[in-house]
Every structure is written in C-alpha cells, then in structure tokens.
Amino acid sequence: MMITLSFAPSRFVRRLSLGAALSAGLVITAMTPAEAAKTTLNLGMSVEPTGLDPTIAAPVAIGQVTWQNVFEGLVTIDQAGKIQPQLAKSWEISADGLTYTFKLQTGVKFHDGEAFDAASAKFSLDRARGAESVNPQKRFFASIASIDTPDAETLVLHLSAPTGSLIYWLGWPASVMVAPKTAADGKTTPVGTGPFKFASWAKGDKVELARNADYWNKDAAAKLDKVTFRFIADPQAQAAALKSGDLDAFPEFAAPELMSSFDGDARLVTRIGNTELKVVAGMNTAKKPFDDKRVRQALMMAIDRKTVIDGAWSGLGTPIGSHYTPNDPGYRDMTGVLPYDVEKAKALLAEAGYPNGFTFTIKSPQMAYAPRSAQVMQAMFAEIGVTMNIEPTEFPAKWVQDIMKDRNFDMTIVAHAEPLDIDIYARDPYYFNYKNPPFNALMKKVQETVDPATQNAIYGEAQKILAEDVPALYLFVMPKLGVWDKKLKGLWENEPIPSNVLSGVSWDE
C-alpha cells in the first residue's frame, strides 16, 4: 500500500495579465524567462555507481542512472511491474516453448548513429551469454542455444529448454541492448537507444545526461533537456540539499527518521511506496557453525523483526520470512515459520552443541539500513549467548571482493533489489554457498511452465523451504522513500525494479 503525504501549496507567483502588459506597451511573443517551463532536473542518489553499463556489473546504482534513460531492452517493465514491448514491438512463442520470434522496431538508432536491428540485438544477447560474458545475470541467457536473424527486423531465439521467465528477464537492466561498435566502452561512456544520451561523469560528484533529440519513440520522448545525478551519501546532507533547492528530487531518500522534517515544507512532497528491496542477513553456510541448520534457525528465532524495523528504519518496512516480497505473485507469509522465541532459540543452540553460544563477525556495508539493522541484531543475539562483532565493509568494491568473490565472511547484510530473485539460492557458486537439491529442482521446474498458477504454486513451495532452512535471516522489505519538488510530475512512486525512469518526468509550472 502506498501512503501519500502532501503539504501546503507552493508560493504564489504573480504574473502580469495580458491587458496590463499591453497597456504598459509591451509586445508579448512568448513566455517570459521567469515563466518558461523548467527543463532541467537535479536528482540525488546515495550511492555512486562503479560504472554505467548494467550488462557487466550488478550494483543497482548502475541501472538507477542508465536503465530506460540511456539503455533500453527488447521489452521493458512498467511501474506496475508488467512487461511491455520496447525495442521489440511484438513476439511469438512456439507451442513447445522453445522458439521465441521477435519483430523489432524500425528506424531506431543508437546514440553513436549505428542502426539498431536484428544483428545488433543478436550481438547484445551473444555478448551476454558468451563464454567470456561477465553479465551479472548471465543465467538469464543460459537456455538460449542459438540465435537467428532472418532479416533486419526479425530476431529468433532457439532454446535448449523451456524458460518461463525469459520474457520477464529480457526486461531487466542486465538485458539491455548495446551498440556493437562502442559496447567495450560502456562502463564509462554508455551508448544506448534511450531518450537520454550520456553527457559527462565527474567521479565522486555527478553524472549528467542530455535529451536525445533523435529518439525513435516520439510518444515517449524526454521532456527534460538535462538531468544531473548528484551522489550524496550522508542523509543529513541529502536533506539539506533538498531543503536548499540544490536538489529537486531524492527518489531513494536514505533516512526515514528525517522524513518528518519535511512536514510543512512549501516546496517539497514526500512519497512512501513499494520496492523489491529484501533486507537479509546472509550466512556462509559452508562454514561452521552456519553449516548447521539448527544454528541458523536459532539465530532467526532470536530476532524480533518488528524491533529491527523500528530500530533500523523508523518502523517503515514489511516483515518477511523468506526471500520474497508481498508485491510478487505467489507470495506466502512465512514469518510464522520461525517466529521470535528466545527460549526456543537457546534450546536449538544447545541441541547443535553450542549451549554457551559462539562468536562471529558480520560484514556490514555502509548503507544506513545495514549497520542499523546489525546493531539491533547484535543486542538480540546477546540474549541467547551469541556475540556478533560488526565489521564495516565498504560497498560495493570491498563488499563484492570479500563476499561475492572470496567468500571471506561469516555473515553479511544487504538489501537484494531484484524482483523475483528467489532463484539465487540455486546458483552455484553464490555467496551463501547454499546447497539444496530439492530447492534447485523447484527452480528448474518453475521455468518449464508459463502458466501463472503453476508457477505461483512452485514459488510457494520454494518460499517454505527457505523459511525452514534459513540460509539467510529474512528481515524486512524496505519501502521506497521519495522526497521531491511538488511541481515535478512523472517520477515513479513504486519501484518494481531499481530505477529512475525519467522519460515521462516534467515540471508542472
């Protein structure tokens, strides 16, 4: 459910009436500069992306700058989480689910002038699925056996096995189309087909995008001439930049405790919407004592999720008991599987051979929700005799190296942002080091059907397995906290996929 909070009207701006202007001897041919519609936007983000190509790295900040602004896909995902055509205007799926035929838009050009056609679409998908691919979602493309391009407007994917989520996956940032001649430079100078072109990047400060005057889809052309993404990590500085007018919007405001500070502001409005941000404390299940399910269950039962939400995010959040959000089809409430129960948690630890508890370290990235959640958990674990040390870990560089690459950790905490990503527990390797053949079988089975009811039932079984086996401690779903100028129109209030989609954004003067 979305809560909308609005405040008092903006300051009244007086304008000369036409009659008064004429009586003063003025000739009016257009809007005066003071009245001209504003066409620039200064938008804040907490985390600066490490690069600008979402097809080569996973951090969500990349897509929050470039997805649907610079880059587009064969299909896209709208604000309601629904699949919509984009660079593919239509598609057909064979009865056996093994052949996907896409009809592509015509007259589309990349920002470097190169034509988008079936050949460049094939290049993009081959690059994503090839042996040398570093695509963060390479598994999306694993079932593509071959690709044909009968003509410039037709792309045919031949699959080795039915893949029920393929169309949905093709709408993700990792699946965008890239220009063959410039793809290698996409990390620093991205080139796509979108309504905005990359203009500049002053690292440590800002990224600037400029309107693409030659954008192919005139119905969705950008209304803004320039967008500047400003990177501000400190929540107090974020609030100050908004109140001073240095920023027009902060769609992912990082300090829930400061939301009330905007009450009564004549210029700004706040929004609270939905996201896919699942805050989980993942354990390295290949290490003792986390290789014992009883220990993991004990830690889960030592946690009062409501207290975590209150302490970490000012009570704004939804408790979860598995790796799934209430926004997603097939959701089941699993918070009652391992409920808060200190005595039961102590008994499980004793049964596992740790009657006096144990000591371990959690690696916590700097994003506000992580250390705050960790501190609340630390106090709760102490009640069952477990000592948790908190090690601040810079995100993304050190966190990715320690957790994702080296697996050098006991526990970590992070918000998984991708929608319907429960299948990450079937990945091998992945940072949980989790091995569960029955779970893996469910993830394979769910791709063998495109029937929503069947998929939802399978996802329900998968949620239950994770709720009982707890390879991660499932805490809460973060809301989307937005603060922006009330004259801004078109910013997404809900976030079915991490993004700042700006083609529909304009100023209502």
Model-derived regions: residue spans:
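Gly/Pro-rich hinge or "lid" segments in bacterial periplasmic/extracellular proteins
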Residues: K82, T163, Y168-A222, K226-T228, ...
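Detector for C-terminal structural segments
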Residues: K38-N42, A202, K206, R211, ...
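Aromatic- and charge-enriched surface segment that lines or borders ligand/interaction sites
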Residues: K89-V134, P150, V156, P289
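Alpha-helical secondary-structure segments
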Residues: N42, D117-S124, T154-H158, G194-P195, ...
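Ligand-site clamp/hinge motif
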Residues: A184, D214-S260, Q378, T387
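Surface-exposed binding/hinge segments that line
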Residues: K103, Q137-A179, S200
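A structural "hinge/loop" feature
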Residues: V47-Q64, L87-A88, E114, P136-Q137, ...
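N-terminal lobe/hinge region of extracytoplasmic solute-binding protein
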Residues: G44-A95, D126, V191-G192
